[in-house]
Regions:
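Rossmann-like nucleotide/phosphate-binding core characteristic of flavoprotein oxidoreductases
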Residues: 1-5, 60, 82, 276, ...
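A conserved FAD-binding loop/helix module that cradles the flavin
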Residues: 298-329
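Hydrophobic alpha-helical scaffolding
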Residues: 56-59, 63, 137, 192, ...
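Predominantly flavin-linked oxidoreductase catalytic cores and closely associated redox partners
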Residues: 109-213, 218-227, 301-306
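A Rossmann-like FAD-binding core segment of flavoenzymes
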Residues: 73-102, 179-266, 356, 377, ...
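FAD-binding core/adjacent interface of flavoenzyme oxidoreductases
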Residues: 1-9, 67-161, 235-245, 256, ...
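Beta1-alpha1 glycine-rich phosphate/pyrophosphate-binding loop at the start
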Residues: 4-68, 72, 149-152, 159-202, ...
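FAD-site-proximal beta/loop scaffold in flavoenzymes
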Residues: 119, 141-151, 254-305, 339
């Protein structure tokens, strides 16, 4: 089985940007694994505009934004596998290599060894089961992302009378999309006293189409046996519990859920990656590396981003850091082999010297691949107070290890 230097899990905006950056930094032996039938990830179903303002300084749709990175990846001849589901990631403690287990219809079960892995699986929507909404389980309840895919890619309209729970960006955009497709969006309800989406989406998707936004409201009941026939909304207090007497019934045949996104953590958990209780994604250092050496994370699997431009920027950094890690580990292995050979030679020479009565043999402290090691030094500690309170900041610079460590121990 071929051994790769880098495997990128996910062919969405984060995975593509990371793979391109790694390739530009000298990693040509890499592979992208994507579970969907085409590259691009979630952007393929986001046919609205508003993408690329920061990255390309122009307004693009989701597929247009994705095609920019797909075309660049194809031009660089970066290999990829589509319709490939990654099942597991393991690490060999003796060699430090990772093994990615994946499966597809063409190749069957794959065991792919590699030196580094970039996690770019994205995020998923919070389902109904995590919301604890009472009532029956009839047809007509979808997450906003599922409805978006049905409308924009599959050509199906989920319903004609719609209520949306949650005011995340996907929910706001789907309120407009369903209206343009001929459905009647009766209300967008939000549990919090403020909207979870961007202000521009509130204006363009709700106010421009006279769709009411009900803040501090939630769904407390779902009616219907075979199909949704209506829902019951109620106002909530500061404790986020329904206030008795504020219930209102809204007839509808579809309920869309836009109640937040959570990072895809299954593979991270299997690998032993530490997760953040705040973001729900992996804990990483300043190099976007997890607690598992050689495993990096970027994009929405790390934390949910508001703009895809920020995803691409972060993923580019992850690709550069992964490339540096691969070069460093390659140098370390070469240095270790050289050090072992030197020690063997010195041991032989020491034995000869001892027999000749010439004293002890010096022990050399070897720093493998000194040009690839860096020592971080802190200096010029200052603080700023942009919000009225001091925020301590420390500047760092990197010193070449060959300059910082040049010593011999006898």
């Amino acid at each position: 089985m071929k051994q790769y230097d880098l495997i990128v899990i996910g062919g969405g905006p984060a995975g593509l940007a990371a793979a391109i950056a790694a390739h530009k930094n000298g990693v040509s032996n890499l592979l992208i694994l994507e579970r969907d039938q085409e590259l691009g990830g979630i952007l393929n179903q986001c046919i609205h505009n508003g993408f690329g303002l920061h990255t390309f300084q122009e307004e693009l749709t989701g597929p247009e934004y994705a095609s920019r990175f797909i075309d660049e990846a194809l031009a660089l001849e970066i290999p990829y596998k589509l319709s490939t589901m990654v099942l597991d990631i393991s690490t060999d403690a003796s060699t430090g290599l990772h093994c990615v287990t994946a499966m597809n219809r063409t190749d069957g079960l794959l065991q792919l060894p590699c030196r580094s892995v970039i996690l770019a699986m994205g995020c998923r929507e919070r389902p109904r089961g995590a919301l604890n909404i009472p009532g029956f389980r009839p047809a007509g309840i979808y997450t906003a992302g599922t409805a978006q895919r049905l409308v924009n890619m599959e050509g199906f309209l989920p319903g004609k009378e719609v209520v949306i729970l949650g005011s995340g960006d996907i929910g706001l955009i789907m309120a407009r999309r369903m209206t343009l497709e001929g459905a009647k969006v009766k209300a967008v309800a939000e549990l919090m006293p403020y909207s979870g989406g961007l202000q521009r989406n509130i204006v363009q998707c709700l106010e421009d189409f006279d769709i009411p936004l009900l803040l501090s409201h939630t769904v407390i009941d779902i009616q219907g046996k075979d199909r949704v026939t209506g829902i019951t909304l109620a106002q909530v207090g500061p404790d986020r519990k329904p206030i008795p007497g504020t219930e209102q019934n809204i007839p509808c045949d579809t309920l869309l859920l836009s109640c937040g996104l959570i990072p895809e953590n299954e593979l991270s958990t299997k690998l032993g990656v530490s997760l953040s209780p705040v973001t729900g994604g992996p804990l990483v250092n300043e190099s976007l590396e997890t607690n598992v050496p050689g495993v990096f994370a970027c994009g929405n699997v790390l934390h949910v981003h508001d703009l895809v431009d920020y995803v691409s920027e972060e993923a580019g950094r992850a690709g550069k850091f992964a490339a540096e890690y691969i070069r460093q580990t390659a140098g370390d292995r070469a240095g270790t082999a050289s050090a072992e050979q030197n020690l063997t030679t010195q041991a032989d020479s020491g034995a000869s010297s001892a027999s000749a009565g010439q004293g002890s043999t010096p022990l050399l402290r070897t720093v493998p691949s000194a040009s690839r090691l860096f020592h971080r030094a802190a200096s010029d500690t200052r603080f700023r107070s942009p919000f009225g309170c001091p925020i301590w900041r420390t500047r760092f610079w990197f010193v070449s290890a060959s300059e910082a460590y040049s010593q011999t121990q006898y």
